[in-house]
């Protein structure tokens, strides 16, 4: 009799085809190992007894031996997954990523399709912070799609660990604080977090920041770690003025210098400001009293603070 040592990822069918050259060899394994059943999960290091020189297909056995192949297909979940909640977010990852994770807190329920052969993961949200990580169990040819199904409201949502190349928010979601660091993608769907008041996008690389204009409840925004092109940052800053719409005042942190000089812009014949640069937009935001009544606008640019003060000489 021979002894076969199990390696990680092997199931009973792998052992049968490796030893006998056909899955029908399972019968001999069950006869020689009284403790064994078809429902058993084999573990690395387990040993099974088999009949020496009993081979159903010698060519298959010889092929594995010649090429040094040990079959280890594991147990795969190949059946359809059923989800009970609305599909809210889809993320796409490069197929070179071997794992992903994120943190979340809030109240409600979350169901995750990790885009591999694993079963759906269900996470109840009870108000405590939850950190979840996942190791993908199979490769994909193109981009890997991860789908998040959920209901409820979120206090904090950090997607940094996904390293997404694409982000699609398909339904409005109640989120208070959102974080996504060091991503290279479009943020066109962020307005689907209409109530968010704290956003950290440090290290974000994107061509357009104007989708952030839709976040009128925003009170804190961090865009550190990236030097944006002046037209990109200017378009956002100018939009904060031209599309103010009674939005909340906000603290915005940047590591890039907007165009122009921090000064009062020229006015047209109707007495309206004609904003010619990003710094002029900041001047208007930090000097318009009606826009600073509740809390002041504040801009931190490379450590220099521009902020509304009742004493106009202290506005820088």
Q: Which residues does each predicted region cover?
A:
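Cell-surface/extracellular proteins and modules involved
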Residues: 1-111, 118-203, 207-224, 235, ...
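Short, loop-centered acidic/histidine patches that primarily coordinate divalent metals
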Residues: 224-227, 253-259
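C-terminal low-complexity, glycine/proline- and small-hydrophobic-enriched intrinsically disordered tails
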Residues: 227, 242-243
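Leucine-rich repeat
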Residues: 228-237, 265-267, 271-273
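Short, flexible/disordered intra-domain loops and linkers
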Residues: 255-277
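A SAM-dependent methyltransferase catalytic signature shared across enzymes that methylate proteins
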Residues: 290
């Amino acid at each position: 009799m021979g002894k076969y040592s199990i390696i990680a990822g092997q199931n009973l069918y792998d052992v049968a085809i490796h030893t006998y050259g056909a899955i029908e060899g399972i019968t001999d394994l069950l006869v020689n190992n009284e403790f064994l059943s078809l429902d058993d999960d084999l573990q690395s290091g387990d040993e099974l007894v088999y009949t020496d020189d009993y081979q159903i297909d010698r060519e298959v056995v010889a092929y594995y031996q010649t090429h040094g192949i040990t079959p280890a297909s594991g147990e795969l979940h190949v059946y359809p997954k059923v989800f009970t909640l609305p599909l809210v977010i889809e993320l796409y990852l490069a197929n070179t990523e071997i794992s992903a994770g994120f943190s979340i807190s809030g109240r409600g329920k979350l169901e995750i399709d990790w885009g591999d052969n694993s079963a759906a993961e269900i996470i109840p949200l009870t108000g405590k912070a939850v950190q979840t990580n996942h190791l993908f169990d199979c490769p994909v040819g193109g981009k890997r799609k991860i789908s998040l199904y959920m209901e409820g409201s979120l206090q904090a949502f950090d997607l940094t660990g996904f390293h997404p190349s694409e982000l699609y928010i398909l339904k409005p979601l109640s989120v208070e604080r959102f974080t996504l660091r060091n991503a290279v993608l479009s943020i066109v769907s962020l307005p689907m977090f209409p109530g968010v008041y704290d956003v950290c996008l440090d290290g974000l690389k994107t061509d357009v920041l104007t989708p952030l204009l839709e976040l009128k409840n925003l009170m804190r925004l961090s865009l550190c770690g990236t030097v944006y092109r002046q037209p990109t940052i200017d378009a956002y800053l100018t939009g904060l003025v031209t599309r103010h719409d009674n939005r909340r005042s906000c603290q915005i942190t940047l590591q890039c210098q907007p165009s122009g000089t921090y000064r009062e812009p020229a006015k047209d014949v109707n007495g309206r400001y004609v904003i010619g640069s990003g710094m002029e937009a900041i001047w208007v935001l930090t000097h318009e009293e009606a826009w600073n009544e509740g809390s002041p606008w504040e801009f931190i640019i490379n450590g220099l603070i521009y902020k509304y003060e009742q004493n106009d000489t202290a506005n820088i």
